[in-house]
Amino acid sequence: MTSTLRTRLAIVAGVAATTLVLAGCSADGGGEPDADTITVSTFPFGVEEFQEAVIDPFTEKTGIEVVVDTGSNSDRLSQLQVAGGQPDVDVMLISDYYAALGQEDDLFQQVDASAVPSLDEIADFAKEDTYLGPAYSYQLNGTMYSTDELTADEAAEWSLYSEDELSGKVALPDISVTAGQLMVSGVAAEYGDGPYDIDAALDQLGEWAPGVLQFYSSSTEVTNLLTQGEIVAADSLSGFATDLVESGEPIAWTAPATGRYMATNRAMIPTGAENVDGANQFVDYLLSVEAQTSSAEIVGDLPVNPGATVPDTIEAVVGDIASDPVAAGYSTLDPTELVPTRSEWVDRFAREVTSR
C-alpha cells in the first residue's frame, strides 16, 4: 500500500513541530477519536525510511492508519506536558533519557504486556523494569577512526585521547548529545569507580580537552571532520559510520576495550492516549521480527528482537555485537542516576571540560 505524505505545522507553547500523515487517507478533522487511526510521534529524521519499513506494512497488516508527528525529543516532551493528560499522540518513539524524564512527570503509562505479545521475543535489556515502555532499537558507543592512521586495537583504547602525537587530531561529543553521556560514563568506568563517577570522568576529560580539536554536537560535524582528514578518531555512535563504511571510505568503528555503554530508543504510550488498543498493536508490530528486520535494513536501526536479520551494512560496522550486545560487554545506563544529575553534569562539563 502506498501512503500519501503531507505536512502540517503544529505550534504548541511556541514550539513548531512537523506533522506528517502517512496513511492511505487522512484522519477526520474532528469529532470522536477514530479507532482505525493512531498518531505516532517520532524523530525528525529518516521519516520516509520509517514509513517504508514500518508504517506502510503496519497499515496493510492491521488496517490502522497512522498520523506521524515529528520533532526533537525535548520539543515533543514539552508538548506532552502542555497537553495536561489529553495528548494528541498515541505512541511516542523517544530516546531513553527523555522517556525517563517524562516518567518523572507521569507523562507515560505502562505498556500492557498482555496486549503486546512481541515483548516475549525481544532481548531482556529492551524490556527493563525501569521504563514503562520497551526499547525498539539501540545505539552503541565506540570510536570511529581512520584506518589509514590507526588500527582497531589502537582506536579501542581510551588512552588514545591523551597521546601527544594525536593532539589536535581527535574529537569528542558534547555531553548534551547521546554519545556524550555514553562517553562520559565510559571514561568514568575506566578511570573512576564506575559509570556515574562524574568527578573522575571530568578530571580525565579536562586533561584531554586541550588536545581535542572539537567537542561536536551532531553526526554531520564529526563525519565531516573525519572524511576531510582534520581528525583521525572520534568517540561516536556506531550508526555514524554505517554510510561511510558502505561508501568505501577508509573509516571504521570499534567498540572501546572497556567502558562499553549503549543508549536505547523507547516506544512509549502517553498517559491519556485516545487509542491505546491501536497503540498496543503498533508497538507489538514494531517489535516483531518482520518490522525489526525491515527497520534494520531500511532505516539502519539495530534490532532488539534476536530473531531479526541484521543486514551486511550494519555487520560491516559492528560485527557480531549486533546479535547480542550484552554478551559483547555492553550495558545500558540507569536513568535514576542520570535524570536527577543531568543539569549539574551538563553545567560542569561546560566549565571543566569544553572551556579548557
Please name every model-derived segment.
Residues 1-39, 354-356:
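Short, low-complexity disordered leader/linker segments with a strong preference
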Residues 44-51, 88-230:
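Extracytoplasmic ligand-binding site segments that recognize negatively charged/polar headgroups
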Residues 139, 203-208, 247-271:
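Periplasmic-binding protein-like
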Residues 270-329:
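Mature extracytoplasmic/periplasmic domains
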Residues 97-101, 227, 232-250:
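A ligand-binding cleft/hinge motif common to bilobed small-molecule-binding domains
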Residues 25-27, 33-100:
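Early extracytoplasmic/lumenal segment of secretory-pathway proteins
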Residues 327-356:
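Conserved C-terminal helix/tail region of periplasmic/extracytoplasmic solute-binding proteins
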Residues 76-80, 99, 161, 222-225, ...:
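Short, hydrophobic alpha-helical packing/hinge segments within bilobed ligand-binding/sensory domains
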